[in-house]
Amino acid sequence: MAYFPVNINIENKKCFVIGGGTVAKRKANMLLDFGADVTVVAEELKQDFEGCKVLKKPFEYDDIKSAFFVVASTDNKKLNSEIAQYCRENNIYVNSVTNADDCTFTLSSYIRQGDVVISVNTSGKSPALSKYLREYIEKIIPSNLSELLDNINGIRQNIYEKYGGNARHIFRKLIDYGFKNQGKLPVG
């Protein structure tokens, strides 16, 4: 089943990562990149979880009662499935790194330049393909999308007021120009 692509604001939301290894670290960093309040629960930490709250202890369901969402990223597939089942039963969004069928959401591979976020998702079927596509896209897009977005946003209201129904065509021309000119827009 394909997952519906949606972008949500997770700034200051309580997000829990269960597990202390490399995959847990990568997932925690993704969440931190978007301002989440990340708590890592693990009996053993194999990584440094800078920026996260850390509960160095065995996982208990009480740990995640206040969670907006949970990432089950232990090296124990059975435990990840049990965590996912608990989350589903308690209406907590959950991602399991060991079984896509346990997930109520997936974490996309993404490119971020300021407020420009481009994500690639394979509905949990092939994270390797998602990564490959992300790396491919990174090679073909300009490195100044954030600047272009800021410039477009700065004139957006004026364009709508001046051009009304033709604004979409004007934006297309401005974006084409910005792609060719390092994010800069024509003056005037």
Label every PLM stretch briefly.
Residues 21-23, 78, 124:
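Residue-level detector of alpha-helix initiation sites
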Residues 68-74, 105-124:
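Short basic, glycine-rich beta-strand/loop surfaces that mediate nucleic-acid
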Residues 49-65:
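Glycine-rich, highly charged phosphate/nucleotide-binding loops
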Residues 38, 54, 93-94:
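Hydrophobic beta-strand scaffold residues
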Residues 124-188:
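An accessory alpha-helical subdomain
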Residues 42, 55-58, 98:
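Short loop/edge segments at beta-strand edges and connector loops
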Residues 69-73, 80-106:
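ADP-ribose/adenylate-binding Rossmann-like module
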Residues 1-49:
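Hydrophobic, well-ordered beta-alpha structural blocks that scaffold small-molecule cofactor pockets
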